[in-house]
Structures are given as C-alpha cells and as structure tokens.
Amino acid sequence: LIQVVEIICHQGRRAVILVPEVYQAEALGEHLRISGKDRVEVYHGHLSSMVRSARWERIRQGEVQVVVGTRSALFLPISNVGLIWINHEDDPSYKDEHLPYYHGREVARMRGECEQALVVYGSTCPSLEMYGKFRRQVRKVLERPWHEGHQVEIINLRSLPYGTIVS
C-alpha cells in the first residue's frame, strides 16, 4: 500500500484510502505519517464538526495528498485522484442501510472511472460479488501465495458426534 501511494504521489496525483472502521482510519493515518507522509489527513464521521470542517477545507484547497477514511471520504472534494484503495472490501460497513442507499465499493468504482484513477479492492477473503465480477471481466486478481506450514483439512461436520470441539 505504502509503495503504491508513493508512486501515485510522485506522479502529482492524490490517494484516497478507505477502511471500514474509524479506529482503522486513525491507525492507518498515523502509520502513513510515521512512514514519511506529511500531507495525510484522516476523515470520518466521528470527528467534531469543527475538525471535520477544517479538514474538508484543507482537502478542498489541495493541501492534502493522501486521505484515509471511512466511506464518507469518497465524497470529499479531493482533486486529481490517482488511487482509490478499498481495504477489506468485503466488510459490510461499506454498505449504507439508510437513504440514500449506496455501497462504498460502487461509489469508489464510479469515482475511479470519472477520475481515471486506479481502484484497488483489498481483502484477505474477497466478497463473492467482487471475486465473481473480477473473474468474469478478466480483471487482474493478485493472490498471495499460500504460506508453507498452513495445513487445511476439510471435515464433514455431519460425521462428528454432537458436541465435538473442532479447532
């Protein structure tokens, strides 16, 4: 993630990184600042209105290169977006259950098309919708190699006595 953000920023473009939860936004924003990114701003709904307004204005004026936030960060007036990275794309927090109904993944895709930005959907276990969509549309799916030492055994739970503990 950090390497991709550096490449995008070096090109003079900006990055939006979405995470499903507020604590993840704060932690990732701090991590990016520690790793040398000084024009990083964190944006989410739990900020006070005064802080949120100040950050919105800094973003609008182009003072910020990287925005880390929850799904509301997609609607910020950040210009020249070169990267939209959706971390844990399978998380249900990206889907809004209230009017207006929207899914952060779809908004990210549409904004990425409008901005001609790279859109990355990151997940350790992708949602079936995205996995199927990428396979049908012949998009690039990067899969991590299976780590040695991990052993998987498929167990038919119907064959085990009731109360058996499986770990």
Per-region residue spans from a language model:
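Conserved motor-coupling elements within RecA-like helicase/translocase cores
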Residues: 30-67, 75-79
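Short, high-confidence coil segments that cap the C-terminus of an alpha-helix
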Residues: 12-13, 37, 64, 117
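Conserved interdomain linker/interface between the two RecA-like ATPase lobes of SF2 helicase motors
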Residues: 1-4, 110-167
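Flexible beta-alpha connector loops of hexameric P-loop NTPases
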Residues: 41-49, 91-101, 160-164
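Conserved RecA-like ASCE P-loop NTPase motor core of nucleic-acid helicases/translocases
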Residues: 13-21, 41-43
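SF2 helicase catalytic motif II
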Residues: 59-65, 71-120
